Amino acid sequence: MAIIIPKVKTNGRIKMRIRKGDIIQVISGKDKGKIGEVLRTLPNENRLIVEGVNLRTRHVKPTSGGESGRIVTKEAYLHASNVMAYSTENKVASRIEIMVDSDGNRKRRLKKTGEILA
């Protein structure tokens, strides 16, 4: 009789070139074309939250006696493969490359424009 061993998902951290604070453009999905700032990243799941993109509506019940119920709209996670870094100066989305300057420091740069990201 064969023993079945389930595949275990590794909790390895995925290298993401997009970081918190970057300006990105959504390249696929229902919010395609939208531009926003990255608010939070989840490197273990390769996901991120972008300001004003992938909004979800939730109906919240009142918690105390005098309070009324409300509708809350907040951003949900996006997969990192659905976004690209965006240059606000040149109005173009681009991939990110890692370059090493003369001092040996690694910097992120947009491939299309050559703009260095902070």
From Swiss-Prot:
InterPro entries: KOW, Rib_uL2_dom2, Ribosomal_uL24, Ribosomal_uL24_CS, Ribosomal_uL24_KOW, Translation_prot_SH3-like_sf. It holds the Pfam family ribosomal_L24. Disulfide bonds: none annotated. Keywords: Organellar chromatophore, Plastid, Ribonucleoprotein, Ribosomal protein, RNA-binding, rRNA-binding. Transmembrane segments: none annotated. It is found in: Plastid, Organellar chromatophore. It comes from the Eukaryota. GO terms for cellular component: organellar chromatophore; plastid; ribonucleoprotein complex; ribosome. GO terms for biological process: translation. Its main location: plastid. One of its GO terms (molecular function) is structural constituent of ribosome. One of two assembly initiator proteins, it binds directly to the 5'-end of the 23S rRNA, where it nucleates assembly of the 50S subunit. Belongs to the universal ribosomal protein uL24 family. Part of the 50S ribosomal subunit. This is Large ribosomal subunit protein uL24c. It comes from Paulinella chromatophora. The gene is rpl24.
